[in-house]
């Protein structure tokens, strides 16, 4: 895959991060393979998660091809950029084409990034996972890499006003150890294992997050924040 668009976009994104004064804590980069296909599965708390996780993976010299909703590809500005970076459009009404495109990318040795919850959660907790990520890894014969991102919701997320000031927010991204799945494995059992790994990573980045969660809109009630519960979040979809 010729990457003519990805490099200049990275330069622009890094310039934005510098302008915002973001303070990064990236962990587990050694778990991102230098070659070969893999599925990276991460939680979804903010609209910039894909760009931040992509930035965190750069030391491994890999470009992640993210699966993202079709509406982003339909936009006159973001659409050409997304296609130029070889991200994968997901049509929620008919996912067959996107599944095949992701499978093809994985078999070519690409890393595909997926938000297995399918949407951002207003609770900032990890919801139930959809099975597509596990099925992709099984079909392509590639490992799954769990990941967690935290802090991005403070910049831009659902139902909140974007905050692009120089706030110097801490941003945490952690990649867990890759694990393999085999064709014939119980999909639900693998999903449960993946979710558990993601929860452990998220708990770790939250525990080490330098800013207090107490009383903050961007933090779940479990950590003393004022975000709605996971159950309430499901009812608001």
Q: How would you name each of these model-derived features?
A:
Residues 1-28, 52, 60, 75-85:
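A transmembrane-helix-recognition feature enriched in membrane-embedded lipid enzymes
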Residues 4-5, 96-237:
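Non-catalytic C-terminal accessory region of glycerolipid acyltransferases
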Residues 15-21, 89-93, 123:
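Short, flexible loop segments at the rims of nucleotide/cofactor-binding pockets, characterized by
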Residues 18-20, 34, 60, 108, ...:
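Short, structurally constrained coil/turn elements
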Residues 23-27, 93-99:
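Glycine-rich, highly charged phosphate/nucleotide-binding loops
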Residues 26-27, 88-91, 181:
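Short acidic-hydrophobic, aromatic-tinged amphipathic segments that line or gate anion-handling sites
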Residues 28-33, 104:
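Short amphipathic alpha-helix with an adjacent loop that forms part of the alpha/beta core around
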Residues 33-94:
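Catalytic core of membrane glycerolipid acyltransferases/transacylases, capturing the structured
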């Amino acid at each position: 895959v010729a990457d003519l668009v990805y490099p200049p976009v990275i330069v622009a994104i890094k310039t934005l991060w510098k302008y915002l004064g973001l303070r990064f804590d990236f962990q587990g980069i050694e778990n991102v393979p230098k070659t070969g296909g893999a599925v990276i599965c991460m939680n979804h708390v903010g609209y910039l998660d894909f760009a931040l996780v992509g930035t965190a993976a750069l030391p491994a010299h890999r470009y992640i091809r993210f699966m993202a909703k079709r509406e982003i590809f339909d936009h006159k500005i973001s659409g050409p950029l997304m296609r130029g970076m070889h991200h994968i459009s997901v049509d929620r009404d008919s996912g067959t084409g996107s599944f095949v495109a992701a499978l093809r990318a994985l078999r070519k040795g690409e890393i595909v990034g997926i938000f297995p919850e399918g949407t951002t959660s207003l609770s900032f907790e990890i919801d139930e996972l959809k099975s597509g990520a596990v099925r992709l890894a099984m079909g392509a014969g590639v490992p799954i890499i769990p990941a967690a991102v935290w802090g991005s919701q403070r910049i831009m997320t659902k139902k909140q006003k974007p905050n692009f000031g120089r706030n110097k927010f801490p941003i945490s991204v952690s990649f867990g150890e890759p694990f393999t799945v085999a064709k014939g494995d119980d999909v639900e059992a693998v999903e449960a294992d993946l979710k558990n790994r993601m929860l452990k990573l998220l708990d770790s980045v939250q525990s080490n997050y330098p800013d207090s969660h107490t009383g903050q809109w961007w933090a779940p009630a479990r950590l003393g924040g004022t975000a709605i519960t996971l159950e309430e979040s499901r009812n608001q979809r």
